[in-house]
Amino acid sequence: MIRVAMTKGRIQKQVTILLEQAGFDMTAVREMGRELVVTIPDDLEIIFGKANDVITFLEHGIVDIGFVGKDTLDENDFDDYYELLDLKVGQCIFALASYPDFLNKKFHRRKRIASKYPRITKNYFAQKQEDIEIIKLEGSVELGPVVGLADAIVDIVETGNTLSANGLVVIEKISQISTRMIVNKVSFKFKKDKIIEIVERLENAQTN
């Protein structure tokens, strides 16, 4: 039995399609109601949870494989896993965004940056050797500059529609985001053949 944790929502839908294309019977997933754990043929048990919980399950050896966004991996300080595959779904970017005049403004204090991702934000500005104030927001991060709480934001940008609707633009692209397949290192040691088989089937589905 291989236990898999998958992020609920958009990633769940996109990975389900990819697994079907790889030849896995995902009927139980498509027909499930409020179940949080389902078993499918090929001896796979799939657990559905929030993105951070997927990493927690993997960290504690509850699951062998996790499907989770690169944004969650970069924000989390747990790194004792193997990243075996970029699924190339859920693609978007991390970006610094603000009003168009951001780069021309003179700041006589630390810049205030709003984000749901303080670790990524801190690392990004540390590479630029900039000391900033990070303001953590959980909701619509775009509100930071709009209400005057922050000078700019670091957030995921998919279409850019929300930014433009609020007068904001991408100042700089930080990194590319997509869904990744990660594996518990102990699981990989003892279940390597089965895990590699899953990777190869997914890779074949991506190229066909």
Curated annotation (Swiss-Prot):
Keywords, ordered alphabetically: Amino-acid biosynthesis, ATP-binding, Cytoplasm, Glycosyltransferase, Histidine biosynthesis, Nucleotide-binding, Transferase
Pfam family, one: HisG
CDD domains, per the entry: PBP2_HisGs (cd13595)
SUPFAM superfamilies linked to this entry: Periplasmic binding protein-like II
Pathway: Amino-acid biosynthesis; L-histidine biosynthesis; L-histidine from 5-phospho-alpha-D-ribose 1-diphosphate: step 1/9
Gene Ontology MF terms in the entry: ATP binding; ATP phosphoribosyltransferase activity
Catalytic activity: 1-(5-phospho-beta-D-ribosyl)-ATP + diphosphate = 5-phospho-alpha-D-ribose 1-diphosphate + ATP
Extent of the signal sequence: none
Subcellular location: Cytoplasm
Keyword Membrane: no
Family matches, as PROSITE patterns: ATP_P_PHORIBOSYLTR
GO cellular component: cytoplasm
Enzymatic class: transferase
InterPro entries (UniProt xref): ATP_PRibTrfase_cat, ATP_PRibTrfase_CS, ATP_PRibTrfase_HisG, ATP_PRibTrfase_HisG_short
Gene Ontology BP term (one): L-histidine biosynthetic process
Domain of life: Bacteria
Family membership: Belongs to the ATP phosphoribosyltransferase family. Short subfamily.
Its job: Catalyzes the condensation of ATP and 5-phosphoribose 1-diphosphate to form N'-(5'-phosphoribosyl)-ATP (PR-ATP). Has a crucial role in the pathway because the rate of histidine biosynthesis seems to be controlled primarily by regulation of HisG enzymatic activity.
Subunit description: Heteromultimer composed of HisG and HisZ subunits.
Domain remark from Swiss-Prot or TrEMBL: Lacks the C-terminal regulatory region which is replaced by HisZ.
HAMAP family: HisG_Short (MF_01018)
Protein name, as recorded: ATP phosphoribosyltransferase
Organism: Lactococcus lactis subsp. cremoris (strain MG1363)
Organism placement in taxonomy: Bacteria, Bacillati, Bacillota, Bacilli, Lactobacillales
